[in-house]
């Protein structure tokens, strides 16, 4: 269940820069517990899905999980052993641009110890340092 946009206005994007902190999506909105990013990074759709699966496997029934990031940036890759020039590569995979402070996952309907365990497993799937936070 890898997520990527169904259609975009343009097939390719500039790489851009990840400077500053996240001013949007940095508060807990849906659940009671959350995983917050502490570093800037590109997080691929595969990494997001791996974290979601790890959490849902731990929570079982009763708990709810919300994924607060969406991979909407295409990353292009050139074929190997290709000479310089002749245009930009083809879109290979999708990433979510994450800045420090951004909430990655939220969880509710479970005790704190279970949530802490599930979120720590999901954080090990992420390529960045994260922290567990509680609303309120």
Curated annotation (Swiss-Prot):
Among InterPro entries, the record links this protein to:
Ribosomal_uL16, Ribosomal_uL16_bact-type, Ribosomal_uL16_CS, Ribosomal_uL16_dom, Ribosomal_uL16_sf
For this UniProt entry, the molecular function terms from Gene Ontology, in alphabetical order, are: rRNA binding; structural constituent of ribosome
Is Metal-binding one of the keywords UniProt gives this record? no
Q: What is this protein called?
A: Large ribosomal subunit protein uL16c
Record's family? Belongs to the universal ribosomal protein uL16 family.
The cross-references to NCBIfam families, in alphabetical order and at most eight, read: rplP_bact (TIGR01164)
- Pfam families membership: Ribosomal_L16 (PF00252)
Record gene name: rpl16
Q: GO terms for CC?
A: chloroplast; mitochondrial large ribosomal subunit
